[in-house]
UniProtKB/Swiss-Prot annotation:
Sequence-specific transcription factor that binds gene promoters and activates their transcription. Part of a developmental regulatory system that provides cells with specific positional identities on the anterior-posterior axis. Belongs to the Abd-B homeobox family. Residues 8-18 have a biased composition (Gly residues). It comes from the Eukaryota. Residues 1-20, 55-75 are annotated as: Disordered. GO terms for molecular function: DNA-binding transcription activator activity, RNA polymerase II-specific; DNA-binding transcription factor activity; DNA-binding transcription factor activity, RNA polymerase II-specific; RNA polymerase II cis-regulatory region sequence-specific DNA binding. PANTHER family: HOMEOBOX PROTEIN HOX-D13, SEGMENTATION PROTEIN FUSHI TARAZU-LIKE PROTEIN. Keywords: Developmental protein, DNA-binding, Homeobox, Nucleus, Transcription, Transcription regulation. It is found in: Nucleus. This is Homeobox protein Hox-D13. The keyword Membrane does not apply.
Length: 301
């Protein structure tokens, strides 16, 4: 095993350091499984991923593996650090790695159908497939990740404005991005019965949006007024006086065009009318006399 390590550090490693190339090999475990592990380590080194040896180690040979490191070539410049993050879609967990000027690469890792990560079922995470449609620079990934994690109860840090709902608009790499806030003042949230953790808002006071319908006809009922039934006060239907009532009123008017309180009470009792009706009739009768007199003057002139 030391010979293999020496070969990898001497000639086969190229420009890499011995410690870096040695990290691709697991702890020495002698037996038939050594050849398979060496082949798996070589395949992992060729693909760019570190290989960690599996199985139980016993005795003095068991020791923790050092962290895996890449072996860059002698002539190749150092690669830009890849920025990665993960998101949940459907029944799988997708890990995304992104470099400067390179599009998102997705690696679908299978998960149990009813897996729950962070207290939320994976079926309830929002779709961020629109992020992978175009090439996005690496400096925008952190902001895009914050924009994606706008679910209720999600632990990722993002600035939240109280009393507003975050409506995130996602654009391409060359288009500006902005966040739109919809005011939800006076609204209370309620959760759906099927267990969805999103928020749906309904009006707290439904009477604010209702308008009062006013009729142009007198005596109609005001409609669309919740929790109240108010009759609009208007003119009552005109009830003509009887001949006996009119005769009694005309006789009193012939005696005196103006009535006092005692005379009004007496006429009200005799005609079965209210005192207000008697007073109004005398007022209208005086106006009628003035119109008649004015017409006579016009005819004479």
């Amino acid at each position: 095993m030391d010979g293999l390590r020496g070969d990898s550090s001497g000639g086969g490693g190229g420009g890499g350091t011995p410690g870096q190339c040695r990290n691709f090999l697991s702890s020495p475990v002698f037996g038939a499984a050594h050849t398979g592990r060496a082949a798996a380590a070589a395949a992992a080194a060729a693909s760019g991923f570190a290989y960690a040896g599996g199985g139980e180690r016993s005795g003095a040979a068991a020791r923790p593996d050092p962290p895996a490191k890449d072996c860059p070539g002698s002539g190749a410049p150092p690669a830009a650090p890849a920025l990665g993050y993960g998101y949940h879609f459907g029944n799988g967990y997708y890990s995304c790695r992104m470099s400067n000027g390179v599009g998102i690469q997705q690696n679908a890792l299978k998960s149990p159908p009813h897996a729950s990560i962070g207290g939320f079922p994976v079926e309830k995470y929002m779709d961020v497939s629109s992020l992978t449609s175009t090439s996005v620079p690496a400096n925008e990934v952190s902001t895009r990740a914050k924009e994606v994690s706008s679910y209720q109860g999600y632990t990722n840090p993002y600035q939240h404005v109280p009393g507003y709902i975050d409506m995130v608009s996602t654009f391409g790499s060359g288009e500006p991005r902005h966040e739109t806030y919809i005011s939800m003042e006076g609204y209370q949230s309620w959760t759906l019965a099927n267990g969805w953790n999103g928020q749906v808002y309904c009006a707290k006071d439904q009477t604010q949006s209702s308008h009062f319908w006013k009729s142009s006809f007198p005596g109609d009922v005001a409609l669309n007024q919740p929790e109240m039934c108010v009759y609009r006060r208007g003119r009552k239907k005109r009830v003509p006086y009887t001949k006996l009532q009119l005769k009694e009123l005309e006789n009193e008017y012939a005696i005196n065009k103006f009535i006092n309180k005692d005379k009004r009470r007496r006429i009200s009792a005799a005609t079965n009318l209210s005192e207000r009706q008697v007073t109004i009739w005398f007022q209208n009768r005086r106006v009628k006399d003035k119109k008649i007199v004015s017409k006579l003057k016009d005819n004479v002139s």
